[in-house]
Amino acid sequence: MAINNENELEYKLIKKNKNPKISNSKKKNSTRPALQDKTNQTLPIHQNQAFSNILPSDFSIIKTPETKTADDFPVNGYEGLNILKFDLELFYKLKPVATSTPKSCMRTGSNLFLNETVKHVPDERLVSNIKNTQTKDSITRDSAYYHRKTMTESIIKTLAAFDAEVDEIILF
């Protein structure tokens, strides 16, 4: 019978404490051991010898860079680079004339491009607001399309040094 009483006691203790080896009396009187201080730190961090390298003994003043004004920069933006290095003579050869479509193009309509009898349509007729000042002998070479193409190429060549994508360049 003694065995049954011990088993009953253990069962009751397990129900109460969930740990049969620690009784209520031991649990109340036992104190938890202090956590071990692995750094051996007894002073504040800035006075502790174990952490002497955290903060420098002398604080150096960090100077912020001065703000540059417009006078500090060179005229062309950056030294050695001239961003607006385009051939401006192309603009002087082209003169704006009108903002509407020429009447000759309106009369023929889209059949103008499908008609086999038309050998060559000057580019200046298709560009409504640009008139070419060159002679008619050199109209194919010096047309508005030719100037726009060379202007586009010069813009792309100029901006190629900046690794700009073609989609980002606004073409006129």
From Swiss-Prot:
Superkingdom of the source species: Eukaryota
Molecular functions (GO terms): kinetochore adaptor activity
Subcellular location: Nucleus; Chromosome, Centromere; Chromosome, Centromere, Kinetochore
Compositionally biased tracts (Basic residues): 15-30
GO CC, alphabetical: CENP-A containing chromatin; kinetochore; nucleus
Annotated motif POLO box domain (PBD)-binding, positions: 100-102
Region (Disordered): 15-43
GO annotation, biological process: cell division; homologous chromosome orientation in meiotic metaphase I; meiotic cell cycle; meiotic centromeric cohesion protection in anaphase I; meiotic chromosome segregation; spindle attachment to meiosis I kinetochore
UniProt feature, compositional bias: Polar residues: 31-43
Role played: Plays an important role in chromosome segregation during meiosis I by allowing meiotic rec8 to establish cohesion at the centromeric central core and thereby promote the side-by-side structure of kinetochores at meiosis I. Enables monopolar attachment during meiosis I. Required to facilitate kinetochore mono-orientation during meiosis I, when kinetochores on sister chromosomes face the same direction and are thus captured and pulled by spindle fibers from the same pole. Acts in collaboration with plo1.
Subunit structure, interactors included: Interacts with rec8, Interacts with plo1.
Full protein name: Monopolar attachment protein 1
Species of the source: Schizosaccharomyces pombe (strain 972 / ATCC 24843)
